[in-house]
């Protein structure tokens, strides 16, 4: 019998008395031995994201195609409880909405789980509607960042979503599936949102899981052709194959543009020993040679990072890896140890060259710290990547020029420039939109579209500045020579780049003949579907 706790209800527009809900289900003693697969099949899906114009899907030849770690964790957890999960990665395998629906109807799972990023909500809704039309008994469960930040609004808008799992979903999904199979009442399942007629009901959440070591190993074995079919972005790795690991969850900072707080600000981490075990597993079973750590804040704990590095060094493990960091979390001592342990690249969220913009973002950092962090990292022999945002509220012609000059002054090897996007769940979203939810903007929220322009500027002007900042960084002789050497040193980059350029030339010719000109999704490419409430 599981323990029970009393938790007050938090229900939109409806109050209920306190009730007893179960704590997480007990798991088998040996997490590597799943329970017998005697229960239902469960499809876990990432829907197609409308980022690229039709005919230009090959752009994925050079972009990051990492599998969804969230789905891998969910699959591993429910498999422990006897369910039979399988994963459909739409974007990675160029699957359309119709392709996904066809696969689901062919496999006939009892449950369909769809992860929702804002850009994919409309396609997820279309998939759900078509599945429901052909198989009304199939239960659609949604989760992910978007639903965790806008559960009520999304469930009211798209009625083919049966149940939403809010926040980290491993234990909640296992509880939910077991409850549904037993014919239980949804009121007894924590961490979910669902509709009762026109009323949105929100069940209380489970306590945050602090012990990530308790989670089973991600179900990499369910991925077809892993890791070959899931490469990192070109020039973003020194060798193949590549795999991703999240060594921790959560971020204690509160940058206004970021939606990470949707899953909580409290940092929870695997032990260094468990992370090392994951690395060894990927090496031994899949031949992985480079790890991308995708933590919100990899260097949240220097002692933990130090211990992991020592485990790698002392064992003689030959692995290279990349991670992200804030500029105020690095020091020469830890950087030197990271380099010895195989750290190849650190990505820093620098965001802007203007202290004024950084302050308005609540970034809790400044230009001087950024310059020092990049200097220390470069001195340690670790490659540096700068992550920037253009078009944030308060941006002006002057701040853009300051950022442009700042980017060029840094000894960074790669620069990612994102078009400011006010994601649901971020503090800035509510500031800009208030309660006026623009769901017609959701399908464009991919960092490739300016949906909003600061006062005194237009979207067209922002697009011009965006191109100018990018080209001013990459068209310099120093950068062109660097990428030439990198291409010659790592032939895997050359093969993918040549394949991309060939496909691009062919597609560009076709598009010009057809009177089209865009690589990124254009307004005329989008299909706006009318969903009945």
Q: Where are the regions a protein language model picked out?
A:
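Short, electropositive alpha-helical surface patch
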Residues: 99-100, 104, 309-312, 396-411
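Proline-aspartate-enriched helix->loop->beta-strand connector
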Residues: 108-112, 288, 412
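Radical SAM [4Fe-4S] cluster-binding motif and immediate context
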Residues: 218-387, 392, 401-405
């Amino acid at each position: 019998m599981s323990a029970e706790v009393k938790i007050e209800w938090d229900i939109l527009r409806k109050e209920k008395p306190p009730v007893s809900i179960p704590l997480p289900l007990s798991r088998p003693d040996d997490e590597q031995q799943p329970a017998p697969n005697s229960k239902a099949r469960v499809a876990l899906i990432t829907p197609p994201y409308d980022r690229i114009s039709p005919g230009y899907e090959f752009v994925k030849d050079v972009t990051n195609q990492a599998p969804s770690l969230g789905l891998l964790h969910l699959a591993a957890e429910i498999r422990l409880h006897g369910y039979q999960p399988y994963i459909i990665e739409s974007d990675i395998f160029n699957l359309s909405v119709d392709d996904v629906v066809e696969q689901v109807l062919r496999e006939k799972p009892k449950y369909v789980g769809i992860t929702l990023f804002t850009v994919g909500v409309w396609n997820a809704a279309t998939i759900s509607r078509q599945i429901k039309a052909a198989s009304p008994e199939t239960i659609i469960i949604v989760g992910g960042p978007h639903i965790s930040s806008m559960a009520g609004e999304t469930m009211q808008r798209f009625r083919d979503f049966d149940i939403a799992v809010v926040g980290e979903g491993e234990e909640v999904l296992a509880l939910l599936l077991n409850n549904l199979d037993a014919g239980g009442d949804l009121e007894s399942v924590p961490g979910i949102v669902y509709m009762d007629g026109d009323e949105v009901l929100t069940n209380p959440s489970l306590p945050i899981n602090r012990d990530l070591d308790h989670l089973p190993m991600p179900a990499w074995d369910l991925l077809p052709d892993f890791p070959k079919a899931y490469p990192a972005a070109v020039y973003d790795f020194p060798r193949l194959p590549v795999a991703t690991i999240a060594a921790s969850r959560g971020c204690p900072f509160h940058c206004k543009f970021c939606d990470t707080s949707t899953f909580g600000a409290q940092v929870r981490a695997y032990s260094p020993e468990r992370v090392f075990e994951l690395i060894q597993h990927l090496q031994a079973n899949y031949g992985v040679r480079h790890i991308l750590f995708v933590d919100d804040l990899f260097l949240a704990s220097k002692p933990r990072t130090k211990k992991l590095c020592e485990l790698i060094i002392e064992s003689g493990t030959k692995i290279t890896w990349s991670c992200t960091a804030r500029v105020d979390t690095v020091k020469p001592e830890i950087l030197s140890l990271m380099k010895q342990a195989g750290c190849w690249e650190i990505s820093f969220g620098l965001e802007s060259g203007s202290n004024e913009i950084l302050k308005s973002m609540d970034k809790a950092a400044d230009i001087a710290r950024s310059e020092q962090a990049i200097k220390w990292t470069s001195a340690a022999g670790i490659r540096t990547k700068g992550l920037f945002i253009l078009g944030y509220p308060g941006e002006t012609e002057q701040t853009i020029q300051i950022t442009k000059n700042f980017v060029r002054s840094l000894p960074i090897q790669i620069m990612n420039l994102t078009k400011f996007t006010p994601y649901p769940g971020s503090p800035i979203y509510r500031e800009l939109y208030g309660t006026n939810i623009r769901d017609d903007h959701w399908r464009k929220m991919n960092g490739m579209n300016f949906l909003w322009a600061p006062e005194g500027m237009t979207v067209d002007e922002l697009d011009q500045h965006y191109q100018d900042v990018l080209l001013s960084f990459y068209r310099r002789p120093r950068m062109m020579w660097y990428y030439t050497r990198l291409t010659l040193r790592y032939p895997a980059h050359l093969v993918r780049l040549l394949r991309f350029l060939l496909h691009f030339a062919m597609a560009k010719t076709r598009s010009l003949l057809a009177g089209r000109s865009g690589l990124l999704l254009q307004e005329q490419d989008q299909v706006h579907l009318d969903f009945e409430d």
